[in-house]
Amino acid sequence: MASRATSLFIFFFLISCTFMLLETNASKNKSRSDLPLCGFREHCDGLWCPGEGGKYSCINWSCNFIEDCEKRIRCEKTGPCCFDGLCDCTNF
């Protein structure tokens, strides 16, 4: 009898932990529309992004993984990528 009660306790404990974990991660997700919309421009070795006052400038953001770029920017045509240690918006 104790093993059934223990099994039920562990089952419901895991269910509640899973729910709390999912709820915590969902609240940390930012809206993609809050990220700057960057693009590709010739003669710019980085990203062409809006800065202060809406003026665009060439910006370089370092990265190790594509997720680093996805947390910082949006791209006009395709998703951002991490290329040679820098975030980039490809022109495809």
From Swiss-Prot:
One of its GO terms (biological process) is defense response to fungus. Keywords: Antimicrobial, Disulfide bond, Fungicide, Plant defense, Secreted, Signal. It is found in: Secreted. The lineage of its organism: Eukaryota, Viridiplantae, Streptophyta, Embryophyta, Tracheophyta. It comes from the Eukaryota. This is Defensin-like protein 294. Disulfide bonds join 63-82, 69-87, 75-89. Belongs to the DEFL family.
